[in-house]
From Swiss-Prot:
The gene is TKT10. GO terms for cellular component: cytosol. Mg(2+) binds at D170, N200, I202. InterPro entries: THDP-binding (IPR029061), Transketo_C/PFOR_II (IPR009014), Transketolase-like_C_2 (IPR055152), Transketolase-like_Pyr-bd (IPR005475), Transketolase_bac-like (IPR005478), Transketolase_BS (IPR020826), Transketolase_CS (IPR049557), Transketolase_fam (IPR033247). The keyword Calcium applies. It comes from Craterostigma plantagineum. Leaves. Keywords: Calcium, Magnesium, Metal-binding, Thiamine pyrophosphate, Transferase. This is Transketolase 10.
Length: 679
């Protein structure tokens, strides 16, 4: 928009067009919600001014290529206000949000789901909805920009240069995850992160005075943010513009802009009430709002002058991307190595033969905890994947989740690939989601004790829903951790994550399986992976393989003769595969025909052909025993009604690992006894 003096005719016309554009956004939200009688009109009505100013006057993007690498990122953390984002994408010319899509809000098969979903709607950067998740994701996006810029920008070429903007609400501010992530954003000095806080003082239960009376601005100042205030977010367009300009000038810390808004602005009877949060206005109030705001148009109408004004973003966006592409071509000539790495991060293309970097193991290789084997494989992968970056929630040494060849990512050392999250599991999870969704070739890893996934489950679920490739390095995965006791010993966790859609749970037993788990995690770009790893030392087992892990389940030993079926099948995962293997040897000494199967990943095994699954677990063999130091829930799928599942269906206890395995009956003897009952 051209700069003009407020008194000139062009200034008056421009100001009038802004108001009309903002009201277009408001009524697209009102009409979409009224059309399906479901949704949240209040937030888009109140936030339309800041949304308009941000998208129309500040953000750089290409509507015809929503995935242009150097675009500014926008996160609607208050995801229930999705119609604000859909309306902005529609006006800006994104093909993903046509008027038909607006009419299909929250309906089956639409590109406009109730809350923004990155995999459904091009132009949506991250999936939001559970309050506060978007704050963490936005921090991850800003972290990725700072890190990649530090690694690949040159004095004469600034190839990574974008801002991350977000709009968050009172609910986001109340959630603990937002404070965890915001604390790290300030610590890391993410100066290109700008948060606009929809400060409307209304929650679902009523006024924020009911439960939220803290001074948010002072809290963020204490965290280390730059804090600005817009007193009039309803029509104070110059205030909003000036605040964003000032925020962009502050480069050493993130900025929070407190924008005082009125939820449901323009509604004569429902504005500034919780009744407009999650309910349609109703026909009478919608019409009254039209009268109040002087909106004479039919539903879903975009006035021609508004349409023309916004249409420039198509050509401007194409020009921005074209200029960047030309600049990258020059960069590639001068800095071929850096350009090749950056291109792999932008495209997500894996180096040819990258998996050859993974270590190999034999039964004669020394035994190790799988957390140690994970460390070996993590560092091998880091050497060939420049986009691998991550860290632990204050358990780096215990999780063994660090890159030896790299330093720490800090405010003054942003090239480091090791992230120190502190004891902030939930924030860590959401931040890694943002990193993963910034660029296809970024592969974030996050680590903690397996039991503490309870602190970050919501973020892991969002990763699975978002198809985000995050690698979760979860150590101390059973009673095998020993004396720390039941608060730290996971029991139900494997079962609970196996129940979660679109996530891989991998529980490797030794070096070959750990290498296979890393191969699977890296190659599955459309879903996250949990690596469930032991604290205790485990032997390298005969018969395990990287290839077997890729199938999720496979035979590691079988003494049946060709053409014969085994009398009994023993199944195990992780640290208990050794127990199954030893039990098999004991039974074979007694003349039994025994097959031992590693079920390292139920999800991958379930995706194999019916023929392959029948080959590994022939249906006519009903004598089956599983062994796993966790809940037996779900094992009936594999052992059947006639089989036995050896496991733990109570909380653990404080004792040595050896004593715990004995007391809970997770032993070779218990597996042998169960097998003998069946065959």
């Amino acid at each position: 928009m051209a700069k003009t003096t407020p008194s000139s005719p062009s200034a008056a016309a421009a100001a009038e067009l802004v108001v009309k554009s903002v009201n277009t956004i408001r009524f697209l939200a009102i009409d979409a919600v009224e059309n399906v009688k479901s949704g949240h009109p209040g937030m888009p009505m109140g936030c339309a001014p800041m949304g308009h100013v941000l998208f129309d006057e500040f953000m750089k993007f290409n509507p015809k290529n929503p995935y242009w690498f150097n675009r500014d990122r926008f996160v609607l953390s208050a995801g229930h206000g999705a119609m604000l984002l859909y309306g902005l994408l529609h006006l800006a010319g994104y093909d993903s949000v046509k008027v038909e899509d607006l009419k299909g809000l929250r309906q089956w098969g639409s590109k406009t789901p109730a809350h923004p979903e990155n995999f459904e709607t091009p132009g949506v950067e991250v999936t939001t909805g559970p309050l506060g998740q978007g704050v963490g994701s936005a921090v991850g996006l800003a972290l990725a920009e700072k890190h990649l810029g530090a690694r690949y920008n040159k004095p004469d070429f600034e190839m990574v240069d974008h801002y991350t903007y977000m709009i968050l609400g009172d609910g986001c501010q109340m959630e603990g995850i937002s404070n965890e992530a915001s604390s790290l954003a300030a610590h890391w000095g993410l100066g290109k992160l700008i948060a606009l806080y929809d400060d409307n003082h209304i929650t679902i239960d009523g006024d924020t005075d009911l439960a939220f009376t803290e001074d948010v601005g002072k809290r963020f100042e204490a965290l280390g943010w730059h804090v600005l205030t817009v007193a009039n977010g309803n029509d104070g367009y110059d205030e909003i513009r000036e605040a964003i300009k000032v925020a962009k000038s502050v480069t050493d810390k993130p900025t929070l802009i407190k924008v005082a808004t009125t939820i449901g602005f323009g509604s004569p009877n429902k504005a500034n009430t919780y009744g407009v949060h999650g309910n349609a206005l109703g026909p009478k109030e919608a019409e009254a709002t039209r009268q109040n705001l002087g909106w004479p148009y039919e539903t879903f109408h975009v006035p021609d002058d508004v349409k023309k004004h916004w249409s420039r973003h198509i050509s401007e966006g194409a020009e921005l991307e074209s200029a960047w592409n030309a600049k990258f071509a020059e960069y590639e000539k001068k800095y071929p190595k850096e350009a090749a790495e950056l291109k792999s991060i932008i495209t997500g293309e894996l180096p040819l033969g990258w998996e050859k970097a993974l270590p190999t193991y034999t039964p004669e290789s020394p035994g190790n905890p799988t957390r140690t084997l994970s460390h070996q494989n993590l560092n091998a992968v880091a050497a060939v994947l420049p986009g691998l970056i991550g860290g632990s929630a204050d358990l780096t040494a215990s999780n063994m989740a660090f890159l030896k060849s790299s330093g720490d990512f800090q405010k003054e050392t942003p090239t480091g690939r090791n992230l120190k999250f502190g004891a902030r599991e939930h924030g860590m999870g959401a931040i890694c989601n943002g990193v993963a969704l910034h660029s296809p070739g970024l592969v974030p890893f996050s680590a903690t004790y397996f039991v503490f996934t309870d602190y970050m489950r919501a973020a892991i679920r969002i990763a699975a829903l978002s198809k985000a490739r995050v690698v979760y390095i979860m150590t101390h995965d059973s009673i095998g951790l020993g004396e720390d006791g039941p608060t730290h010993q996971p029991v139900e966790h494997l079962a609970s994550f196996r129940a979660m859609p679109n996530i891989l749970v991998l529980r490797p037993a030794d070096g070959n399986e750990t290498a296979g788990a890393y191969k699977v995690a890296v190659e599955n770009a459309g879903r996250p992976s949990i690596l469930s790893l032991s604290r205790q030392k485990l032997p390298q087992l005969p018969g395990t393989s990287v290839e077997g892990v890729g199938r999720g389940g496979y035979v590691i030993s079988d003494n049946s003769k060709d053409g014969e079926k085994p009398e009994v099948i023993l199944m195990g995962t992780g640290s208990e595969l050794e127990i199954a293997a030893r039990a098999g040897e004991e039974l074979r000494k007694e003349g039994k025909k025994v097959r031992v199967v590693s079920l390292v990943s139920w999800e991958l095994f379930g995706e194999q052909s019916k023929e392959y699954k029948e080959m590994v677990l022939p249906s006519e063999v009903t004598a089956r025993v599983s062994v796993e130091a966790g809940s037996t829930f779900g094992w009936e799928r594999f052992v059947g009604l006639k089989g036995r599942a050896v496991g733990i269906d109570r909380f653990g206890a404080s004792a040595s690992a050896e004593r715990l395995y004995k007391e809970f009956g997770i032993t070779v003897e218990a597996v042998v006894a169960a097998a003998k009952e069946l065959c």
